[in-house]
């Protein structure tokens, strides 16, 4: 009988970008097992100018990345709404959310909000309550302090799930 290789846990950070609150969630994925590591949010003061808020988000994420040392990152894609200015500002926060891990040499994946919901809940139009219920099941030790931190954990779970599928497809293809 051939010995099975030891599967090393991979640490993943999920990031839910926002100008008021950027959520982050760190998990470890080992095979199909998920382990909660930590979560929270970066909240720059509302009265700061835009550039200073973006800097605060970057500095906050850089501290989280240094403290938790994830190997991979996942960021939620921005949805376009009717307010073009708000969408552009959210896009700037998202740029910071992608830049911070990249500056640490961490690969960054992107997932659409509906893809996150479908992966975690099974329905692409799930609400925040349904996500919270599934987080309790998938990560029973997690107690996210905000909806943004919960969303970030869901993004990390989505990445863990999709990276496993990608690894399996590569194995089947002999790569």
From Swiss-Prot:
The keyword Transcription regulation does not apply. Its EC number is 3.1.21.10. Binds 2 Mg(2+) ion per subunit. Its main location: cytoplasm. One of its GO terms (biological process) is DNA repair. Signal peptide: none annotated. One of its GO terms (molecular function) is magnesium ion binding. Keywords: Cytoplasm, DNA damage, DNA recombination, DNA repair, DNA-binding, Endonuclease, Hydrolase, Magnesium, Metal-binding, Nuclease. The RuvA-RuvB-RuvC complex processes Holliday junction (HJ) DNA during genetic recombination and DNA repair. Endonuclease that resolves HJ intermediates. Cleaves cruciform DNA by making single-stranded nicks across the HJ at symmetrical positions within the homologous arms, yielding a 5'-phosphate and a 3'-hydroxyl group; requires a central core of homology in the junction. The consensus cleavage sequence is 5'-(A/T)TT(C/G)-3'. Cleavage occurs on the 3'-side of the TT dinucleotide at the point of strand exchange. Belongs to the RuvC family. Homodimer which binds Holliday junction (HJ) DNA. The HJ becomes 2-fold symmetrical on binding to RuvC with unstacked arms; it has a different conformation from HJ DNA in complex with RuvA. In the full resolvosome a probable DNA-RuvA(4)-RuvB(12)-RuvC(2) complex forms which resolves the HJ. This is Crossover junction endodeoxyribonuclease RuvC. The lineage of its organism: Bacteria, Pseudomonadati, Pseudomonadota, Alphaproteobacteria, Hyphomicrobiales. The gene is ruvC.
């Amino acid at each position: 009988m051939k010995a099975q290789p030891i599967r090393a846990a991979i640490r993943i950070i999920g990031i839910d970008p926002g100008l008021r609150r950027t959520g982050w969630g760190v998990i470890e994925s080992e095979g199909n097992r998920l382990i909660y590591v930590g979560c929270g949010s970066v909240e720059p003061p509302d009265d700061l100018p835009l550039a200073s808020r973006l800097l605060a988000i970057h500095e906050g994420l850089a501290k989280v990345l240094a403290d938790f040392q994830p190997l991979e990152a996942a960021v939620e894609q921005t949805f376009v709404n009717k307010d073009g200015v708000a969408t552009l500002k959210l896009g700037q926060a998202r740029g910071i959310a992608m830049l911070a891990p990249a500056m640490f040499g961490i690969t960054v994946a992107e997932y659409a909000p509906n893809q996150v919901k479908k992966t975690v809940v099974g329905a692409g139009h799930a609400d925040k309550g349904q996500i919270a219920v599934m987080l309790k099941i998938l990560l029973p030790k997690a107690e996210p302090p905000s909806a943004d931190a919960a969303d970030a954990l869901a993004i990390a779970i989505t990445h863990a799930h999709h990276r496993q599928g990608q690894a399996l497809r590569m194995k089947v293809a002999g790569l």
